[in-house]
Amino acid sequence: MELKTECLPAGVLGYKACKYKAKDWDSTKYRSEATNNDEWSGFYTGSTETLTFGYMPDCTDNQGNGTAYLNIVNITTAARIIVCQDERFKSPVQDKTALLNEIKEALRRIEIPVADSDLLIPTLARYRFYFKCYNNEDSNDMEIIIPNDLVDNVALQSYKQQIFINGVGQTLTKYVK
């Protein structure tokens, strides 16, 4: 597996499906409520609107009702990112444990000391890296995972909203703050 590191300039990063409007984003509150107890714990940002639309229903209540907000994600300062273009991530049936072990080994090869027992994304926070890979939806869309502990430089911008009634998404409309 090949990984490369890049520097992202401040500016638009992608899209985020949220239960809240952009004006209600609070990175301090998010960090206090977020858990870092999983390999992939983080703040997920879709590279395209199409990819992110798929997460809109996750923003509803248990009956499938509510309003989901598609916000534009900006970063306020430059950030370092690890890019993984391994196409095996595109498959939802791929053995993720094997991929995870390969990622950790590849990170060690580029001198980022991640132990096999370390949780991947939370550990990358210590070294101030985001992670980018393909989404597992058989597409060419990628997502950027910002470790929960690094969301201080995230700013959300109002973009679109969608009302859901009994799990059915209504017309997507633009919204302002």
Name the predicted role of every residue range:
Residues M1-E39, E49, M56, T60-K177:
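Active-site and NAD+-binding cores of ADP-ribose-processing enzymes
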Residues S41-Y44:
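Active-site nucleophilic cysteine motif
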